């Protein structure tokens, strides 16, 4: 049987699910950019790309050389194709305007160019997260600058989302709203090849991912839930759990997508005015879309993440996602107060 490449899969989606050709072309361009980022990441010290730039992004985080390089790769790959009305990146203060010399399209691309970049120098898996939205009609102009408001759509409006993970293999996980597919980069062929069909997150789990060093800062519902997990068979859940924490959202969520579990990044007492650490637009929404399409669930503790109306490009949010039964349990604990 011939192997199904990403290009072939997208063409088949156009035929069977009426996926617009412009969206197909956009996904292929993003995938090519991810291949280029993968190549740069794999070179590491040999390519002179490790270490920091000595600058900070809008989040106040120190930018790694590969953060900046990955951001530029995605911008340059996607700005000229005519598929996009604009882009927004975690590494940039404001929306990226498509240069006037290029035609504009009907979509918006939102991305975290290199998630988990604090792990780059120690050779731990990192990745690229992206989300595709339709640009509202009132913002579809060829000449005017794109207003940030065009991007502020709830996650339910995403038409596609995915992530590339750069590990022992480079993989692209993708949803177009009809399930989740996984593609592995065949470096000899130079293409992403379908290797994981209709991924499904198990409803129950025996694994959880959370940064335990922050335990003293958690809110009571999170402390209660994690205490029950740690109690194992002797506790109310009557089951032993294992903890896994990589400190790279892409890597942690990838494990949960492929074998189950719950990922937690709660708000805490250190910054009580902030509703969480992770970015709604660049991380939480695309990952929640993927997890839900695989049969899992994702909330901020009290509300489905995909239902949250964004108020700003860099809005933060608490995240609980993964196996449905566990996400529902900790959400219930939050709602009980």
UniProtKB/Swiss-Prot annotation:
Binds 2 magnesium ions per subunit. Its cofactor is Mg(2+). Mg(2+) 2 binds at residues 112, 115, 283. It catalyses: beta-D-fructose 1,6-bisphosphate + H2O = beta-D-fructose 6-phosphate + phosphate. SUPFAM superfamilies: Carbohydrate phosphatase (SSF56655). CDD domains: FBPase. GO terms for biological process: fructose 1,6-bisphosphate metabolic process; fructose 6-phosphate metabolic process; fructose metabolic process; gluconeogenesis; sucrose biosynthetic process. Substrate binds at residues 115-118, 211, 277. GO terms for cellular component: cytosol. The keyword Cytoplasm applies. The keyword Zinc does not apply. NCBIfam families: PRK09293.1-1 (NF006778), PRK09293.1-3 (NF006779), PRK09293.1-4 (NF006780). PANTHER family: FRUCTOSE-1,6-BISPHOSPHATASE-RELATED, SEDOHEPTULOSE-1,7-BISPHOSPHATASE, CHLOROPLASTIC. Belongs to the FBPase class 1 family. This is Fructose-1,6-bisphosphatase class 1. It comes from Azotobacter vinelandii (strain DJ / ATCC BAA-1303).
């Amino acid at each position: 049987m011939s192997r199904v490449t990403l290009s072939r899969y997208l063409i088949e989606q156009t035929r069977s699910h009426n996926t617009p050709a412009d969206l197909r072309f956009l996904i292929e361009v993003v995938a090519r950019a991810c291949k280029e980022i993968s190549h740069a990441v794999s070179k590491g010290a040999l390519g002179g790309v490790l270490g920091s730039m000595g600058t900070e992004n809008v989040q106040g985080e120190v930018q790694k050389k590969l953060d900046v390089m990955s951001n530029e790769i995605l911008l340059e790959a996607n700005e000229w194709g005519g598929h996009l009305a604009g882009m927004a990146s975690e590494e940039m203060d404001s929306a990226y305007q498509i240069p006037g010399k290029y035609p504009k399209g009907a979509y918006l691309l939102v991305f975290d160019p290199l998630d988990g970049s604090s792990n780059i120098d120690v050779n731990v898996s990192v990745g690229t997260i992206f989300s595709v939205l339709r640009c509202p009609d009132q913002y579809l102009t060829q000449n005017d600058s794109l207003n940030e408001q065009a991007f502020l759509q709830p996650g339910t409006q995403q038409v596609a989302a995915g992530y590339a993970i750069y590990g022992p293999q480079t993989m692209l996980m993708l949803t177009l709203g009809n399930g989740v597919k996984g593609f592995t980069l065949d470096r000899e062929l130079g293409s992403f090849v379908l290797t994981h069909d209709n991924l499904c997150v198990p409803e129950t789990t025996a694994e959880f991912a959370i940064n335990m060093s922050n335990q003293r800062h958690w809110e009571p519902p999170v402390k209660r839930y994690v205490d029950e997990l740690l109690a194992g068979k002797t506790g109310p859940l009557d089951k032993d759990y294992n903890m896994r924490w990589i400190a790279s959202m892409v890597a942690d969520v990838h494990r949960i997508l492929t074998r189950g579990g719950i990922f937690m990044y709660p708000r805490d007492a250190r910054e009580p005015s902030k509703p969480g650490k992770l970015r709604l637009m660049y991380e939480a929404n695309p990952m929640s879309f993927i997890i839900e399409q695989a049969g899992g669930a994702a909330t901020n503790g009290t509300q489905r993440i995909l239902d949250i109306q964004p108020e700003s490009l860099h809005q933060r949010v608490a995240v609980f996602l993964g196996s449905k039964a566990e996400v529902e349990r900790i959400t219930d604990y939050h709602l009980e107060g």
